[in-house]
Amino acid sequence: EDASDRTISMEKYGDTPVKRLSKFGLLNRKSILAHCIHLDEEDRKIIADSGAAVVYNFDSNLNNQVGLPQLAKLPQSVPVLCGTDGMNAKPHSTFRNLFLFGRHQGMSFGDAIALVKKSYFDQITFARHYFHDFPTLQQGSRADLIVWDYIPPTPFDQNTFWGHYLYGVLERNIHTVIQNGNLLMDHSRIQFPQDIYFNSIAVQGARLKQSFEKES
């Protein structure tokens, strides 16, 4: 993420982080490389040849003042995933930033939208490397669905979907959640007792805070 990661790696080991990972056989189609801000052309080729995925975490990059990845330089064959690096619980917001930063870096509107579409489907493909039963919308597939409470104010079709998705759908509340055919949320109301989960979250949150305080 930081330029210092690359600098220290070069000073201590004579190679970039990507080249070191490759040298030790740690790059393959199940590998996730986070951030990838400070890459050279050889790094990008190694990533592309390995089949590894790159995960962008723009909120973290901006918070840490380390710059942003050069989106257009990554080979098209490299899977692009959208993450948060723990900065929030809304990885879909990274989709919008992927579009905006693409535009900021000089991409045409069409190319920036194409990158968002690529990332959307790259994530589905990558998930199936780990979860072979990751569902589809085809008949007979496991019913894992989310329905947003969104009424489009302008024409909504295959040509306008991505604009609606980025600036309309993702701004709305979740209306329905179905997991394996079970209704978990209906009309934005969770359909099972939540207290036991929230209590556990509070306990684990306090434990995590204490562990960080001990380390510091």
What are these regions (language model features)?
Residues 63-69, 90-94, 157:
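Short, charged, surface-exposed secondary-structure boundary motifs
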Residues 23-26, 72-152:
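His/Asp/Glu-enriched, well-ordered alpha-helical/loop segment
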Residues 47-59, 203-211:
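Short, electropositive alpha-helical surface patch
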Residues 117-216:
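Active-site microenvironment of metallo-dependent hydrolases
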Residues 1-53, 64-80, 132:
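Histidine/acidic residue-rich metal-binding segments in metalloenzymes
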Residues 35, 56-57, 82, 148:
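Conserved beta-strand positions
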Residues 1, 58-63, 85-88:
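Short, acidic/turn-prone active-site loops that include or flank metal/cofactor-
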Residues 33, 47, 54, 85, ...:
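Divalent metal-coordination and catalytic microenvironments
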